[in-house]
């Protein structure tokens, strides 16, 4: 609720778009749910994407805010993506503000030109909720880009909620006392599917990294 209130302070309104160039971590879930609470349309790419791949997607939707991270992890390595973020910002003129997750708390100098996500949580909480239409867009996904630039695919909130609940509760038999894991990144629609599991009351497990590091069965532990 604090982050959703911060988005209001940035004058983001229902129907505005927020683009997220982010790893699969708890801050990403918070950001997505805050957007949904405010009727803001979410769209995400994973940080392993190159800058041009991100631009090809996000430039189409004209986001006002970009949410990103200073680093992500893969194969035991921390990988800085802020140079790619700078390139994305240069090519998408609609971006007015950039909010960054600070993975390494001692490296605050990385964030001097951006808004530190932790600072956004120092605002007061707003627990009020507004009702939106059944088919109000909740997020924009993209086609693979194999036949030209990726194409936008908009999903309605009510449709997504019903479909995901059907799949989790009837097809997968997920209940509110269970834990749900699916290896994915934020650039794949399965991340959106995984987050939908929260509607069942289950707990979801997030994993940022390679599925075979440090050993082949890491995701089975």
Q: Where are the regions that the model predicts?
A:
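Conserved pre-ATP/AMP-binding loop-to-beta segment of ANL
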Residues: 99-100, 112-142, 149, 157-164, ...
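ATP-dependent adenylate-forming carboxylate-activation enzymes
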Residues: 22-23, 43-59, 72-73, 77-81, ...
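Generic beta-strand/beta-sheet core signal
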Residues: 21, 45, 69, 101, ...
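Conserved AMP-binding/adenylate-forming
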Residues: 4-55, 179-184
